[in-house]
Amino acid sequence: LRVFLRVKYHQDIKALYEAWGTAFWSEVYSSFDEITLPKTAQMFMNHHQILDYRRFAASQTNDFLNEQCLLIKKYAKNQWVTTNYIPNYEEGHIGGSPALDFQSYTRYMVYGDNEGIGRRGYRVGNPLRIAFANDFFRPIQGTYGVMELQPGQVNWGSINPQPLPGAIRLWMWSVFAGGGDFICTYRYRQPLYGTEQYHYGIVGTDGTTVNTGGREYEQFMKEIRQLRGQVAASEVKPAEYFARRT
């Protein structure tokens, strides 16, 4: 953090404490060596300090992802590389690693803490969580998708309800309707042991019986094939779409 701040403020500690407003509550620093990570235990924290810390954390994360990506490509030149972002939008690193070939994110819609919308929302989830993620990731590189979509009941939530029948299919259609290019799921087969033993997969523990979520994946794949046959490969988005600005 200190190295990051020295570079950002050009070795000028006065520029830092003026930017942070540290004169209030006697937070003036005499050198960069006095600066520590923000302490959540203290009653109030300097918001400018927290902002710079988050910028530092984002920079470190992006540098690490770029390093790993370039290392893989060094030995597997034809391999595409992405990462499975958890879209917590307060974390500034999301979408900031240019070495990645495309963007992907994870989405779990029903896990007890998500109220959703309407009477059935508890088992469907809030549709805004997919809609916003689509709009967030689409402009970064153009190509994006969901690398990890909930395949059924999970085990790690405060309460773990079964998704409402049809909900998983609805999520998949929502991803593609928003411009997504692909969908993957967390696991194919539900395991017989381990921490996430009760986390569903596409098939059950016997490796052959298709779970409820797996049947919705099957249905969606049939539907998307039918739709693909009705869309000309030469079709492009209208010019008005590309002209939009937010």
Language-model regions, residue ranges each:
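Polysaccharide-binding and catalytic clefts of secreted carbohydrate-active enzymes
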Residues: 1-132
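Carbohydrate-binding surfaces of carbohydrate-active enzymes
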Residues: 29-38, 66, 74, 78, ...
